[in-house]
């Protein structure tokens, strides 16, 4: 059984998961196409973070919701540790983020992922997301999917 809870952006387990995600992404993409969000650069009011833990309390995955100035929000930092993949945790993370967005009456959720992350693209499609054009602050990037 897994649990999902909201955590502060400075949570040490969240920092560990995000560092694993950053290392993974740096192997896939050059720096100019690596759109990682440094959580410490975002105010607490702009960000909500969640973490998934296994039955032993071990951090298994994470995600975040970044509130944008135009009144929409972006799904960020979705990551599942490799040993926990294939258990529908991605769907649970996205669903939890969507609940947070709904509670904030956000009219639109967006996201960016990379072309080399086919499982992530498949996850977002299963969750009902469709490919669209780049949105601010992004510019079109052949290695990104929006």
State what each model feature region is:
Residues 2-76, 81-83, 94-96, 100, ...:
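Acetyl-CoA-dependent GNAT
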Residues 60, 88, 119:
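Residues that form or flank phosphate/diphosphate-binding pockets in enzymes
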Residues 2-3, 7-10, 107-110, 114-146:
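C-terminal "cap" of GNAT-fold acetyltransferases
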Residues 81-83, 87, 115:
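Active-site acidic-Proline motif in GNAT/NAT acetyltransferases
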